[in-house]
Each structure stands twice: as C-alpha cells, then as structure tokens.
C-alpha cells in the first residue's frame, strides 16, 4: 500500500514538474496593443535596433545578431554577428542565424514586419519614444525574459536617482529652454512631442516653442526662427549638432558668425551649450536617466 502511494506521489510530482517545464518554455511579451505569444522560449534572438540592444544588454539577455550602427552597440555584443544597418537588416544574415525572435522598435514595424513575416520569423516591436515608455520597457523585457530581478534593480536605481534630482530642484528657479538641432543647412527646435520634452518637464523647464508655435504641441520639431527665439529670450540655449555642413563648417562656427545671439539671456548667462547627440538626438532608452541627469547639469550647473 505504501509502495503504491509512493508511486502515485512520484507520478504526480513528475506531472507537476513537466507542466512547470512546459510553462517555462512558453513566451509572452506585450505593450499596449502589441502582443506576441510563442509556444517556445526564444534562444536565438536578434535586434535590428541600437536602442533596443542597450535594453537587452542591461538585462543580460544573449543575442545572436545586432545591427551595425553609428550609435554605440553595448560591449557585451562585441563578438555578435552584425546583421546590417539599423532599420535595414540583411535578411539573408538574419535567416542564416536561425533566428527565432526579433526585437525591434515600433517605429520600424511598418517597414520591417512584412519582411520578417516572409521569413516566418516572429517579431515584436517596442515603443520607446519617451522617458516613461523606456522605463516601462525595462519592466516588460524583464518579465518576458525572466529577468525580473535585474529589471527591478535597474528601476530601483533609476527611482533613487530621480529622487536626488527632485531634491536638488526644490531651490531652483524654473528655466526657459530652447533646444536647437540641425546640420548647418537647416535648423529646428524641439517640439512638445520630442523625447527631450519629457526630460524638460521632469526638471521644471519650459520649452520656448510652446509660446512660439501652438502646433508645437503635436510636433517633434518646429522650424527655427531667430526672430522668434530672440523674442522668447530663453535662459538656456542647447545646441544639438548632427553633422557638419557641406563646407565643413561646424555648428559652433555658424552660430558664432551671427552676433544676434548676444541679445539673449542665454548668452549673458554663458548658457549657450552643445549637448551630446548620443544621449539627446533621439530616445536614450535604458540610458534615459543618464540623459535626465546630464540635462539637469547643462541647465542648472
């Protein structure tokens, strides 16, 4: 009798373990209306995005393919196969890696999903346009890839650093900021729908474009106007260089050639500064807290 009970218990334990293993093999990831469910846990993961590669590296997720990019790919993936330029992968390479999941950005979905579908490779697209979305993606990836402990540690550190900034801001006067970017041929100012707007909000800064162009509320950028800039008279002007002009002139040389800048508070405060395009040209992703701290230093220190 005891022997039979032991056998039954062993069978039950075996079934429980089997079900547990099966459950672990399943994979689910979702964000807003995007959802992907697989009946297996992916082992050969590729990303075609430099931004996404930094999220995955922070969570210690192994990849078999990453993009070639002017934006730095994490050192963790130094020996990993390059699949072509960000947003323009070499599909033959992707296929040859026996890829079983591609993680990309929502921005790339319209162009790339049909191509991946033709290869019968599942793909998922993350929205990382804003600071808050980037924080959400850390949690989403942590849950999907069973890296909750790492994700929680990252988010805890970010929360702590946010609290330090919040304390520093208590005795600071809010500033009016203009963020200008371009290549010397044309210039723009960041609108309310730009990644940088979320950072400005978090350090109590006003984006001057809201007083210049009502449509800025819906845009990532608005055309630059020197006349409007002088009228708005920002406390701080941050320049985001993207490249040199055709004549080889730098962003700074072009601005120095125009003495009208001297009429602004920013000039008088010695607060016309160039900012790092690596952190600020687009969403900084998992490094968004670094961008927030850096923006604070540019504005207030």
Question: What is the meaning of each model-derived region?
Answer:
Residues 2-8, 18-51, 149-180, 241, ...:
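Bacterial Sec-exported substrate-binding components of ABC uptake systems
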Residues 31-33, 81-92, 214-226:
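Short helix-initiation/N-cap motifs at beta->coil->alpha
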Residues 47-97, 101-106, 205-208:
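A short, structured surface patch at a secondary-structure boundary
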Residues 67-71, 197-218:
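His/Asp/Glu-enriched short active-site or ligand-binding loop at hydrolase and phosphoryl-transfer sites
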Residues 73-76, 108-144, 276:
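Flexible loop/hinge segments that line or gate small-molecule binding clefts
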Residues 91-104, 121, 225-239:
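Proline-aspartate-enriched helix->loop->beta-strand connector
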Residues 128-140, 178-199, 245-248:
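Extracytoplasmic ligand-binding site segments that recognize negatively charged/polar headgroups
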Residues 133-136, 143, 152, 166-167, ...:
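Structured C-terminal subdomain patch of bacterial secreted/periplasmic proteins
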């Amino acid at each position: 009798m005891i022997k039979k009970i032991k056998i039954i218990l062993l069978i039950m334990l075996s079934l429980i373990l089997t079900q547990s293993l099966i459950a672990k093999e399943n994979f689910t990831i979702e964000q807003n209306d995007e959802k992907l469910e697989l009946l297996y846990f992916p082992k050969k993961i590729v990303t075609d995005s430099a931004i996404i590669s930094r999220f995955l590296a922070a969570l210690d997720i192994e990849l078999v393919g990453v993009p070639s990019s002017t934006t730095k790919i994490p050192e963790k993936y130094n020996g990993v196969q390059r699949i072509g330029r960000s947003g323009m992968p070499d599909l033959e390479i992707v296929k040859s890696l026996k890829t079983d999941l591609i993680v990309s950005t929502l921005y790339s979905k319209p162009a790339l999903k049909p191509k991946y579908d033709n290869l019968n490779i599942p793909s998922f697209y993350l929205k990382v346009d804003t600071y808050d979305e980037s924080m959400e993606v850390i949690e989403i990836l942590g849950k999907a890839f069973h890296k909750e402990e790492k994700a929680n540690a990252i988010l805890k550190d970010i929360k702590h650093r946010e609290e330090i900034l919040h304390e520093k801001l208590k005795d600071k006067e809010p500033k009016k900021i203009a963020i200008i970017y371009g290549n010397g041929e044309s210039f723009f100012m960041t609108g309310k729908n730009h990644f940088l707007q979320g950072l400005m909000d978090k350090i109590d800064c006003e984006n001057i474009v809201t007083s210049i162009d009502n449509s800025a509320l819906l845009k990532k950028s608005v055309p630059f106007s020197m006349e409007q800039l002088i009228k708005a008279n920002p406390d701080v002007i941050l320049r985001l260089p993207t490249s040199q002009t055709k004549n080889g002139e730098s962003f700074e040389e072009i601005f120095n050639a125009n003495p009208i800048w001297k009429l602004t508070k920013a000039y008088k405060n010695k607060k016309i500064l160039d900012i790092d395009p690596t952190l600020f040209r687009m969403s900084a992703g998992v490094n968004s807290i670094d961008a927030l701290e850096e923006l604070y230093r540019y504005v207030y220190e």
